[in-house]
């Protein structure tokens, strides 16, 4: 049986203050592979390297994971404040239009923590900083 390909959106991290990486938590990869019986595909949150139409055609579904960085308040009509914390603008540029395209197409996805906030913002909602 061919396992469905499930895209997992990566988070941007800096290692040793200089080395930028795209990463996904092992627990998310294990959940896709073992629980959902899918083939995990780690999707870098790098807008210049990722084409949303290609992703949608290749993946049966997506997982939008949690992460330290928050959705930038500009995405829901607010100005950033210190309460918002750090941001990952590249991830915003991938996830928000991807979610909108998935909803339009009726393709399945799951949002966890930040991922659920991305779904909310992509659908026109706002967030409260804490």
Report each predicted region and the residues it spans.
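The feature captures the ABC ATPase H-loop/switch
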Residues: 116
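Conserved G/P- and acidic residue-centered "switch" motifs that form tight phosphate/ATP-binding loops
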Residues: 113
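N-terminal beta1-alpha1 cap of cysteine-dependent amidohydrolase-like domains
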Residues: 1-110, 120-123, 128
